[in-house]
């Protein structure tokens, strides 16, 4: 159980924290008392593939003097990213084929993805959209208005998923606009927000954002992205609790990552800590086979073994659903655990 004595004077200047993010690998390693090592970042090619970006609030949860820290391994550029495998491609889910208009992706029957923002507060090395052509999908007013018009015309839709990038990179007044606009479309019942920003910068959960999300007729769901229990600290607990008190549904999805969270003990710690802060474990994803991420991949067979062991360690409602996603399918695919 996390310590309940949490400071009440948390600042809300998340934009300052965003601006002060670390983008230089040398600075990051110095902060963590680690020596520069060419295999991590010296290869300019790796940096060009996908630059480093990590807020200091997230770095503060990393263990110093530990090159294998599970939070560090998620964000530090590594020459392993140059390893080629023909099964790992730039668009593993073929999302570009499902683009309706710039920034609007329809993969499912009753719900639609709106890419509200094209950037993130943190660059996770395993990101399945690390090669997504965001420059072709600017989140400007023109594209947003086209997206809204499409959603209005599609009466079979009842849920909008805000994605990105990270949708909470939008400022509060922008969130207010999209919430108000969608709430005026009678057939839209739910608004789901997929985000990692409050995890890495908890102060993003401003009082104003809470007010916006609690004064709409839409049912609000927030799906966080947390992969390891070490990511959860007192500041995150305090800010997540503000959302919980408003009755907002809080779910979490994780990615199974080799060398980071690929064992049942680590996953059990994560599930327990998530529930301690009122977030329900929802999905455990097999890594999408995006180029430059082969070193993170855990096979479906090994993942099944891990989850079967996890079932014996924690209550069933704390066990996330093991899933993968295939291009062309209109839903996630549940992985068979082969239990006898």
UniProtKB/Swiss-Prot annotation:
Catalysed transformations (reactions):
L-lysine = D-beta-lysine
UniProt GO MF annotations? 4 iron, 4 sulfur cluster binding; isomerase activity; metal ion binding
InterPro entries from the UniProt entry: Aldolase_TIM, EpmB, Lys_aminomutase/Glu_NH3_mut, rSAM
Cofactor mode of binding and number, as noted: Binds 1 [4Fe-4S] cluster. The cluster is coordinated with 3 cysteines and an exchangeable S-adenosyl-L-methionine.
Q: Which Gene3D superfamilies match?
A: Aldolase class I
Task: Report the enzyme's class at the first EC level.
Answer: isomerase
Query: Which NCBIfam families does this UniProt record tie to the protein?
Result: EFP_modif_epmB (TIGR03821), KamA family radical SAM protein (TIGR00238)
Protein name in the entry:
L-lysine 2,3-aminomutase
- Gene encoding this chain? epmB
């Amino acid at each position: 159980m996390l310590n309940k004595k949490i400071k009440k004077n948390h600042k809300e200047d998340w934009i300052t924290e965003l601006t002060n993010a670390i983008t230089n690998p040398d600075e990051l390693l110095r902060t963590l008392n680690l020596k520069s090592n060419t295999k991590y970042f010296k290869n300019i090619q790796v940096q060009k593939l996908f630059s480093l970006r990590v807020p200091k609030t997230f770095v503060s949860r990393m263990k110093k003097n530990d090159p294998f820290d599970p939070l560090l391994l998620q964000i530090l550029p590594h020459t392993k990213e140059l390893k080629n495998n023909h099964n790992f491609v730039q668009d593993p889910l073929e999302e570009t084929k499902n683009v309706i208009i710039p920034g609007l992706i329809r993969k499912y029957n009753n719900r639609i993805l709106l890419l509200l923002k094209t950037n993130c507060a943190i660059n996770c090395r395993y990101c399945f959209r690390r090669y997504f052509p965001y420059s072709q999908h600017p989140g400007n007013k023109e594209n947003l208005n086209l997206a809204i018009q499409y959603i209005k015309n599609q009466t079979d839709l009842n849920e909008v998923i805000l994605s990105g990038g990270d949708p909470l990179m939008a400022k509060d007044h922008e969130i207010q606009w999209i919430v108000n606009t969608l709430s005026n479309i009678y057939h839209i019942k739910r608004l789901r927000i997929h985000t990692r920003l409050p995890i890495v910068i908890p102060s993003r959960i401003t009082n104003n954002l809470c007010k916006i999300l609690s004064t709409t007729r839409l049912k609000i769901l927030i799906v966080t992205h947390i992969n390891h229990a070490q990511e959860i600290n007192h500041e995150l607990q305090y800010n997540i609790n503000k959302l919980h008190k408003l009755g907002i549904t809080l779910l979490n999805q994780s990615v199974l990552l080799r060398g980071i969270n690929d064992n049942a003990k680590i996953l059990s710690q994560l599930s327990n800590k998530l529930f301690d802060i009122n977030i329900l474990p929802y999905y455990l994803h097999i890594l999408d086979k995006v180029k430059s991420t082969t070193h993170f991949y855990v096979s479906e067979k090994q993942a099944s073994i891990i989850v079967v062991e996890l079932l014996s360690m924690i209550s069933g409602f704390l066990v996330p659903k093991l899933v993968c996603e295939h291009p062309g399918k209109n839903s996630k695919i549940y992985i068979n655990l082969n239990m006898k």
